[in-house]
Amino acid sequence: MKGLAFSLLLSLVSPCPIRAADQLEVTFDGVVIPVDIKDLVAWGRSGGVSNTELGIWLDLLEPASRRGMLELLRAPLITNRSMARQMLDSWAGRRLLDEVADLVRVDDDTVGVTVLNTLEVLLSKQPHVTSLDLLEALPAKRVRLDLDGLLGVAEHWRGQLKHQQALVNRLDQIPITAVAPSQSISIDATTGRAPLSKALTVAHRPRPLQLQLWQPPAERFRSNARDRSWIVLMPGLGGSPDHFRWLGRLLSAKGWPVVVLEHPGSDSEAVGAWLQGRRRPPGAEVLPDRLKDLEAVLQAQASGSLPVVGNKVVLVGHSLGSLTALLAAGLRPQPGLERRCRKALDDLPLSNLSRLLQCQLSAVPLPSIEPPSQLLAVVGMNSFGSLLWPRTRPVRLSVPVLFTGGTLDLITPPLNEQLELLVATAPAPGSGAVVVQGASHFSPIRVEGQAGEGKGNDLFQLGEELVGVQPLQVQALLGEEIVAFLTGINATSSPAGPSLVHRQVGELHLHRMDPAGAASLLSGS
């Protein structure tokens, strides 16, 4: 048990820089336990060979625990100097460092300035930084680790994961209403009909926006519809129009013209530049330009300079693209965001990373843009906004919405985000949410080679641990649900269905719900 506790301590400490000054003071159950840092560093650098009192004590650990501690101490924490510097200089990086500083106190530094400065010095001298490097370099008279606080954070994380698992259990209890075999996926992301490319000059950017236009086949064009609609599709943070060729192709084949936006500064090129250490990671500060991108596309279509026919528009987005759509629809953060964020970010938000973007929005001035008068509906894949529009302060969205998500999503978990949003935005009739078991935040993204064995040459090198199970089947199900939603809102009347629907397609389970169904699931959380 002691070995397990000490391994936990080191696993939590190792990412946080501590200097081998004199002692590391560990606060545990109200008791301060001193650990000689010099002895700990010597033990780590020697590969576990040390005759000090601490070394003798550590020799009593189980071999697996000893190896794990040595690996944590000696493994590189930072392997890309430039990328790490940019991350530490970003809003999200500073916010995370601030939270870590509450748990690992260096002298009287409560905001992590000492840690940040030490990392900067180390990164200016060497390309890689290990825990041992930080232990030796951090200038401090006293370092205190609040193990009670760390255990509290871990308990909070476990609680959040239990809430998500409880949602899965409640979904499993809903009787299956339809069973179908797996769908045959015959269209790959790089084959079949290709989109048209269009460059759109905009006033707020130095270079034209690059758009993908998916025009319906002549025989499928919805020329008889009273309110002919078209679709604007916006990728998420680090996303590319090519990630959604499958959806553009599908929707245009069903009769809707589709325009897929590029968002310079928050697209795959921007995130790639961050990974190479050439810029800060993009965050919520990109939203004003994203909103202006969308406004420019809508104006170009209305003036006829964008060759897309339609009287009504549907805004579709993935992740940050979904948030862009909701803001464009007229929603603005409800008062009290900073207070809600102080509470939400009191623990490291690793089970809901979207909270960092939501909270950064309090420091971002949003442009004054009128909601498009021709707005027909909003579709948000892996959407988020529970801190912006909490259930306790609902805000009215005047058009139908469809939110989709997956049970393996720890960036925008469906229980906290899509279901909360559906209830909080009090949307128009016809609104709903779809949750796919085993799908993740990246399931809607199709990259080159995903249909085969390879991962392709793409920024998103996605394996099953990130993209979830059966991504092509998940995309087929999501496409089917989006088409059904769009067809329903165009219908003159549609009969009300059950609040909760459980479909099984092959091995996948899909759950569709209206706001009442979402509220009933949330009430059980």
Regions found by a protein language model. Name each.
Residues 31-181:
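Mature extracellular/secreted ectodomains of secretory-pathway proteins
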Residues 172-226:
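N-terminal cap/lid segment of alpha/beta-hydrolase-fold proteins
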Residues 306-319:
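Alpha/beta-hydrolase fold nucleophile elbow
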Residues 236, 316-325:
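Gly/Ala-rich beta-loop-alpha elbow adjacent to hydrolase catalytic centers
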Residues 397, 403-405:
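Short beta-strand/loop motif that positions the catalytic acidic residue
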Residues 225-236:
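Short beta-strand element of the alpha/beta-hydrolase
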Residues 280-307, 323, 327, 337-352:
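Alpha/beta-hydrolase active-site loop
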Residues 238, 242-245, 250, 262-288, ...:
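Cap/lid segment of the alpha/beta-hydrolase catalytic domain
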